[in-house]
Amino acid sequence: MKSKKIVVTSKYIDQNGHVGEAGYLSIAIDALWEFNREIGTSQKFLQLSCAPVTFSSKIDYLKEVFEHEEIEFRIERLTPPEDKRKWIRKILLFKSSGELAVRILANGAWFDLNSRKITTPPNEIMEIFDKNFYDSEIK
């Protein structure tokens, strides 16, 4: 499991003065892609013409988060389905107090960027994912 700290900016704040529905998902995906750049998977996705595609996301909102608040982003790749073309990912956003603010559980698959079809990912991509985030059960 990998994590990073994020300071919430005004672009994620809704009319209620807290991070809104779209804001939480944007924070999570922005941090996810930044993390992918840091570990080199963004380039690997392009080199190997295979990248993740999300089919569904379930978001549980547990605590309010406000502008300028520091939160911690954590990502886990959960035990994959038997079909190796698919994946399950959990993203957690924690308040600085340690309280869980948001849980995002997503299901997706690996997408061949040339054929535009679902595929089994190359071993090189899976080795990077196994090294950087893995958890054996959904919490």
Predicted feature residues:
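Hot-dog-fold acyl-thioester-processing enzymes
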Residues: 1-56, 112-139
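A structural microfeature
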Residues: 102-104, 120
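Hydrophobic beta-sheet segments that form the core/acyl-binding groove
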Residues: 58-96
